């Protein structure tokens, strides 16, 4: 991960809310659900899964399952394998997502918000503008970000990407 302590964000930051993740934890990522949601949002037929074969001994088989999204990529066939049919299906869905770059497409529901409140989790009470500086200088490990819609209601997201519009060199402050 790049060191970002050289920059401090200005007040023009936006939170670009998305499900995009750079490092995906396979245990926590629901690849089948993500693929179903992708197809539903884009009005494609749901992905189809076909069991191709079962290899190995009966007490420890390996399953191979093919995943296809006919409306999106008619000739695309992505094969996942696993020690159970469930694992093979999940791996086939993940391979489809990865090979088709579905996590980087602009198909997710994205909305821009201005930063309303940033509260760092540190023991001392920060100065009014210290919240953003704290994010970069390592004084805190977590930052609570509250996003509000124009009507004032709080918007919750499972993950988000912080998009920096302007930045300044820390020596200029």
Curated annotation (Swiss-Prot):
Gene3D superfamilies: 3.30.160.20. One of its GO terms (biological process) is siRNA processing. Pfam families: dsrm. GO terms for cellular component: RISC complex; RISC-loading complex. Coiled coil: none annotated. GO terms for molecular function: double-stranded RNA binding; siRNA binding. Keywords: RNA-binding. Residues 30-102 form the DRBM domain. It comes from the Viruses. InterPro entries: dsRBD_dom, RLC_Component. This is DRBM domain-containing protein 340R. It comes from Invertebrate iridescent virus 6 (IIV-6).
């Amino acid at each position: 991960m790049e060191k970002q302590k050289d920059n401090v964000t200005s007040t023009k930051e936006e939170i670009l809310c998305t499900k995009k993740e750079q490092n995906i934890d396979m245990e926590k990522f629901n690849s089948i659900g993500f693929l179903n949601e992708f197809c539903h949002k884009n009005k494609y037929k749901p992905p189809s899964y076909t069991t191709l074969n079962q290899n190995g001994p009966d007490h420890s088989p390996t399953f191979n399952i093919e995943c296809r999204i006919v409306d999106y990529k008619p000739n695309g066939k992505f094969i996942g394998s696993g020690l159970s049919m469930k694992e093979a299906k999940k791996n086939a869905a993940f391979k489809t997502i990865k090979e088709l770059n579905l996590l980087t497409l602009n198909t997710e529901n994205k909305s821009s918000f201005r930063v309303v409140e940033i509260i760092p989790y540190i023991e001392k009470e920060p100065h009014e503008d210290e919240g953003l500086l704290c994010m970069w200088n390592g004084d805190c490990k977590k930052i609570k970000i509250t996003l509000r819609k124009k009507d004032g209601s709080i918007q919750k997201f499972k993950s988000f990407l912080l998009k920096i519009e302007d930045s300044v060199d820390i020596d200029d402050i």
